[in-house]
Amino acid sequence: MGTARLRKLQLLLLLGAWRALGGAARCRVTLVLSPQKATSAVCRSSEATQDSELATLRMRLGRHEELLRALQRRAAEGGALADEVRALREHSLTLNTRLGQLRAQLQQEARAEPDLGAEPAAALGLLAERALDAEAEARRTTARLQQLDAQLREHAQLMSQHSSLLGRLQRACAGPERGQQQVLPLPLAPLVPLSLVGSASNTSRRLDQTPEHQREQSLRQQGPPSSLLPTGHLAVPTRPVGPWRDCAEAHGAGHWQSGVYDLRLGRRVVAVWCEQQQEGGGWTVIQRRQDGSVNFFTNWQHYKAGFGRPEGEYWLGLEPVHQVTSRGDHELLILLEDWGGRAARAHYDSFSLEPESDHYRLRLGQYHGDAGDSLSWHNDKPFSTVDRDRDSYSGNCALYHRGGWWYHACAHSNLNGVWYHGGHYRSRYQDGVYWAEFRGGAYSLKKAVMLTRLVRL
C-alpha cells in the first residue's frame, strides 16, 4: 500500500513541474517501477483441476481422521491400563506392609517360645503359612504390575509412532504442491505419560529391595526356557482331544507337543502338564518350581488334592499321583537347575505312592544320574504336612522346612520348601528348595521338576 502512494506522489510532482513550465515544451516521462514479489498464491488452475485437487485433499483428510480415531482408541486403552497400574501399585504397597507385619509377628513369637508344644507349633505354622500366602500374593501382584508396565510402554511407543506419522502427513499436505491450499493441523490425542510408566518400574524395584529379598521371586519376565525344564511361560496350545489315560498314551497317539492335557484318574478328569519331548516324551509332570509364584507351605488337604497351575508352578496332588502310579510300573525323573544355569538329573527306575490309608508312603527304586541321591533316604516314609506330622523326628519337620514332604528326621532333600531368590539364603531353618547332594542344603535351587511315566520295556 505504501509503494502505490509513493508512485502517485511522484506522478503528481512531475505533472506540477510540467504545468509550471507552461506546457511550452513537451516532455516524455518514463516511470521505472521496481519489481514486486507476490505475497499470495497465484492460481492458474482451471475448475476441473481445482476439483481434482479438492478430492485429493479430502482423501488425505479422511486418512488423517482414520489415523486420529485409531490413536484416540489407543489413548483410551492406555488410560485404562494406567488406572490399573495405579491400583496395583497401591495394592502392592499394602501387601508389602502387611507382609512385614506378619514377619515381625512370626519372629516375635518364635523368640518368645523357643520350645513349642503341639498346639503352639500348629498356631505358629498357620501364622507362617499366612505370611507365605501374603508373599505369594505380593509376587503375583508385582508380576502383573510389570506386565502392565510392558503394555504401557508398548502403547506409548505405538502412539508416538502414529503421532510422528500424522506430523509427516500434515507437513506433506501443507507443502507447496501445485498451489494447494494449506491444510489446518489435526489435534493429536495425548500420549500416556512416561512418568507413570517409570513409577511402575520403580515400584517393582522397591519390592525387590525389601529386607527379606531372599524370599522375593525374580520379577523379570522369564525368557524362553531350555528344553531341559518345561515351564509355563510359553503359550499353552489348545488341549488335544482327551481325556487320556496318561501322557504316554497321548504321546503314542501322535501328540508330541508338550502342554496341558486332560487325564482321567478314577472318576475325575485332571489337567496335567505332559512333557512330550524330554527323554522320549510321555512324562507326567507332578511338581514344578520355577519362580516362587505359588506357596507350597500349606496343609494336608491341599497337598492331597493338588494346587497351582499346570503351565506354571504346581503340585499335581498326592491322590492323583497315587492314581497314576497305580497303573503299572512307573519311573521317576527329577530335573534340577541352579542359579548359574547348571543342570542335573536324578532318575529312579521305579516309583509309586501308597494310598491315603498309608499316608501316601513313598516307594522308590534304584538311583541313576548326576545330581546325587538325596531322595532314597526318604524311601518308605509317609508324607507329612504342618497339620499331619508323621515324620521320625520329635518336632515337626514340615513346620521347620516350610513345606510338605516325605520327611525322615528330617530331610536330605525338600523340593517343596520356600523358593528363595539367588541361591544361598539366610534362614533360621533349612527351608529352601534344596537337594543336599546338588549344591547343599543352604542353597535354594532356581528350578526343580518331578516327572513320572510308565516304565518302557
Swiss-Prot record:
Cystine crosslinks: 247-274, 397-410
Compartments, as annotated in UniProt: Secreted
InterPro entries: FIB_ANG-like, Fibrinogen-like_C, Fibrinogen_a/b/g_C_1, Fibrinogen_a/b/g_C_dom, Fibrinogen_CS
Short name of any one Pfam family annotated for the protein: Fibrinogen_C
Record-linked SUPFAM superfamilies: Fibrinogen C-terminal domain-like
Domain Fibrinogen C-terminal stretches: 238-456
Listed Polar residues bias regions: 219-229
Protein function: May play a role in the wound healing process. May promote epidermal proliferation, remodeling and regeneration. May promote the chemotactic activity of endothelial cells and induce neovascularization. May counteract high-fat diet-induced obesity and related insulin resistance through increased energy expenditure.
UniProt-recorded name of the protein: Angiopoietin-related protein 6
Organism: Mus musculus
Gene: Angptl6
